[in-house]
Structure formats: structure tokens, C-alpha cells
Amino acid sequence: NAEIYTGQARWDDCIAACDELAKGGFALDKKWNDTFRADNDKRSTEIIWSIVYDEVYAKGMGWYQRWLHYAHQTGWDLQSGPWNGLVTQPTFYDSFADNDLRKVEGFLIGKQYPRKVDENGNYYYDTTAEPLKGSEEYNGQDLVFVNYIKSMTEGEENSGARSIKYEIQPGTTGDMNNDWVMFRYSEVIYNKAEALMRKNGGKATQEVVDMINSVRQRSFKAEDWEKAKYTTATLTMDEFLAEKGREFAFEGIRRTDLVRFNKFVTT
């Protein structure tokens, strides 16, 4: 954001810094959510800088408490009760393609069921079991998250999609093991791509398209990729900003991006 605050663009410096970081041995994780697993300190090749958390030795990571409903405590075998607090803005949730794995796997929407773990350690929702139940406006009724918020002051207990971007382990306490991701290699790719676009009059070259697609591709199944990938015609500056919002949702960098794109105070 050098140009915003000093009046002097430093896109060449940005590109040079990104090129230096690319020499550091970092690599994109194979799956979009490997970066946010409970063992991301060991699993991820993408994380450059993170805040260390541990349920015993470095407490404070309470992602699920902020997003999940009270009923998830028993339904998901959690030792500490969620607060039913944060929800996703409906327009943002709708901005994801329906076959985008960041949407399919990264949010809770619809009827809520107990979550189980199979013999291979994979999570699944037990739709043969009794659905989780509401306890406020929908007391005793099936808990069904809807992509709708009545108002900022009168949200109902089932309002909004809930983010599960960070893995929530069964039996976890209110202090999760996931390290909080501050900066990852995919952001380096995005930063260089944006700098190249801005030096090219805001238009994407094939190099830029390939860079963004290298991050985006893991969020789609192979059979869906041909229609999902960007081209030099579809990757506009506005679409770049929108896709960066989806890729880095809830990671704390959106304000900086909106300021740089002169959209922080626009609707």
C-alpha cells in the first residue's frame, strides 16, 4: 500500500521481494484447507509466518467457539460450548461457485447433524442420526442454518453460514491446536500477480493468470476445473479482488486490500 500512504508506487520492489521469498523453499499445499489443519505446524509447506497455538502449552485459539451453535458441543463432541456468534455475510457466501470446495467444505449451511470420524480419520456428517436442535427461536426444532440475516440487531440463532476453515478436532477444548496463519506463500503469489497487473495497466497477462490459477485450482475437482479457471479475459482487477477475498477469507487482510483498491468506503 505504499502508493496509498506515500504517493509513490513500489510495484518493482514488491516483485523483487516476492521473488526473494520464492527462493525460501515454500510451496502451495495440495489441498486448500491443509494450511488450516490442527497439525498445520507440521503438515503445511505453505505457511511462512504463523502464531503458535497448542491446547496445553499455548492456549487461545478459539475459532469454533465464535462460529458454531450451542448444539454443536454435544453433536461434535466438543469440550467447551460454542457461542453462536459470528456468521458470514450472505452476499459473500453467494460469491463462491457452488462447486468451489472452499464453499462446500469450508462453511456450514442447511440442516445440522452430528459429526463423526471414520476408520481412516475422515470427518463425515451422520445424516442417519437425529439432527441437532435449536434452543432459542427454534427451540426443539431441527437446526437449519440459512444464508439470511434478519438484521444486524435481530439475527436469529440459525442466521448465516458458519466458517469451518480451521479444522475442528473432535474432543477439542476451547483451545485448539491449529496455528493461526498470518502470512502464507499463496499471498506472495497474489502480491506479485497484482504488481504485474498494475504495471500492465490493470490487465492480466498469461503469466498472471497462471499464477492465480495455480492457487485456485486446488479448490475445484478435476472435472470442474475447465470452467472454473481464469483467462486473460475473465481475470479483471475487480475479479482479482473478489477472488483474493474468497481465498483469504477471515485471514485479516481484507481491509488492507480494499484500501489499496480504493473500495474500503464504497458499497
Listing of model-derived features with the role each one plays in the protein:
Residues N1-A22, W49, D100, D179-Q217, ...:
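Extended, hydrophobic/aromatic-rich amphipathic alpha-helical segments that build helical scaffolds
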Residues Q8, K59-W63, F107, E226-K227, ...:
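Short, solvent-exposed loop/turn and secondary-structure capping segments
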Residues W11-D12, P82-L86, F92-Y93, T205, ...:
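Generic detection of long, well-ordered alpha-helical segments
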Residues G25-L28, F220-K221:
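Helix-capping and short linker residues that terminate individual alpha-solenoid repeat units
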Residues A27-I189, R198, F264-T267:
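Elongated scaffold/linker segments in the mid-to-C-terminal portions of large proteins
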Residues W225-E226, R255-V259:
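A glycine-biased, small/acidic residue-tolerant capping/turn segment at secondary-structure junctions
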Residues W225-T236:
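Short, mixed-charge amphipathic alpha-helical segments
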